[in-house]
A protein has these predicted regions:
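Active-site-proximal alpha-helical scaffold in enzymes
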Residues: 29-58, 94-124, 179-186, 273-286
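N-terminal extracellular/periplasmic Venus flytrap/periplasmic-binding protein-like
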Residues: 103-190, 253, 258-260
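Beta-strand segments within the central parallel beta-sheet cores of soluble alpha/beta enzyme folds
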Residues: 24-29, 53-59, 103-110, 128-133, ...
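Short, well-ordered amphipathic alpha-helical segments that serve as non-catalytic structural scaffolds
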Residues: 14-17, 37, 86-93, 109-114, ...
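Single conserved hydrophobic/aromatic residue that forms the stacking wall/gate
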Residues: 1-16, 20
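Conserved catalytic cysteine-centered active-site region
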Residues: 14-50, 81-86, 146-172, 253-285
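Glycine- and Gly-Pro-enriched alpha-helical subdomains that act as flexible
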Residues: 185-233
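Flexible glycine-/small-residue-enriched beta->alpha junction loops
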Residues: 46-97
Length: 286
């Protein structure tokens, strides 16, 4: 199927002429899709099935199909809140830990400030490729902006009229893409390449779907246990900021050190294009 991005992108690029012989597939784990692609490639390398692979993700959030006004819900599942929206799950987490609107707004403001500082200091320069679009050169993410606290506080709740989450404390609608090469270490050194990081452990975990954003807690615990590490052993953490409330829930419930988390800002400032985000946060962590 030529329109699948993993197949069509290499064909469109200046890749080797025999690129069509390489296997390609689509991975779907929503927000974690391209991170799951990293996991699958590393597993393939560990098993000896592959030497290297490209993990990439792309998303245009303006084209996400689930946002229409006529969704076809299965009535039995709907009664069980299976189709609860992501914003509603974040509201649940905010209520569970009594995370105030003020705390969420402060978190969002800090995300923008850190991202702006990182842009000013050139922290993203080595991870962003300049592209041309409509005769305009794009050299940096457009999301980070100087926060206007007065305007932020004037916003209405976005998902629950009595809730605490607003557009300002949610990740914005955005477009993005990210990619990386995962390779067998011996082969990389043979080719005189300079690996940026080593995958020591990986894990996924399921949670109550009405508390979707709590997933990083059990997944991180599993990954740390497999690696023989504690959260205190980790110097830097990239935590996807789907919502400020969700991020604060994970940080507080897990007892994570805020000084180590998203030091260059997160998705509330940079954006959260679903397919892109998993690999984007790994690239930023490097």
């Amino acid at each position: 199927m030529i329109r699948r991005p993993p197949r069509s992108t290499p064909l469109y690029s200046s890749a080797a002429s025999d690129v069509y012989k390489r296997q390609a597939k689509v991975v779907n784990r929503f927000c974690g899709s391209s991170m799951d692609a990293v996991h699958q490639i590393s597993q393939s390398i560990n098993s000896g099935d592959s030497i290297a692979g490209i993990a990439a993700g792309v998303e245009d959030m303006f084209q996400v199909p689930m946002g229409g006004f006529n969704p076809s819900f299965h009535p039995d599942l709907y009664e069980k809140e299976y189709y609860i929206g992501m914003g509603e799950t974040a509201e649940n987490l905010a209520k569970d830990l009594d995370i105030s609107r003020n705390d969420q707004e402060e978190f969002s403001v800090n995300s923008h400030k850190k991202a702006l500082k990182a842009q000013e200091d050139g922290k993203f320069n080595n991870e962003i490729l300049e592209i041309e679009f409509n005769e305009e050169k794009l050299t940096k993410d457009e999301g980070p902006r100087e926060p206007n606290l007065e305007k932020i506080k004037s916003l209405n709740p976005a998902f629950d009229e009595n809730g605490t989450i607003t557009a300002a404390t949610s990740s914005p609608i955005s477009i993005g893409a990210a990619a990386m090469i995962i390779m067998d270490e011996t082969k990389a050194l043979e080719m005189n390449l300079n690996p940026k990081f080593r995958i020591k452990s990986r894990a996924v975990a399921g949670v109550d779907w009405t508390r979707m954003g709590s997933g990083p807690l059990p997944a991180t615990e599993k990954a740390l246990n497999k690696a023989g590490l504690n959260i205190s052993d980790i110097d830097l953490i990239e935590l996807n900021e789907a919502f400020a409330a969700q991020s604060l829930y994970v940080i507080r419930k897990g007892g994570w050190d805020t000084d180590k988390i998203n030091v260059n800002g997160g998705a509330i400032a940079l954006g959260h294009p679903l397919g892109c985000s998993g690999s984007r946060i790994i690239v930023t962590l490097m």
